[in-house]
């Protein structure tokens, strides 16, 4: 058969389609300007598990950049404003084919609840022959507790574009998978 996987990719391609443009903010119905909903930068945190809905553990981070570079784990965002698309090539580890992708737009640093920056995430490692987990990674349940920068009354005013997050799941099966991610604003103005 024909292999449709790009030659530069280490793993299988995952195509990401971003929708929502932040308008589906669940905390308010406040409208937002185009500059508030724009995606200027994007980090994709990849978690893997043995089964769908299982114990997802951190695998790697992909960051938006000027060029696609699989070795550096960077990707180029195509499109403009809120209509963005991207492709990543996550590392495949035997035994953990189920992936959960957490996308964070317009915020490059994550914090613990007390305001301190998070410690570096620990990547899961599996035995290449058996697929058994040899090194446990940071759990997705812990990752979901992290925060973006806290706004202080005396601090810098809220800037645009606004922080948005979204997530999606897929399984490494064929050469290409498409994941639709709905980004939601995490802050709004009143």
Q: Model-flagged regions — what are they?
A:
Residues 1-190:
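Sec-type signal peptide cleavage vicinity
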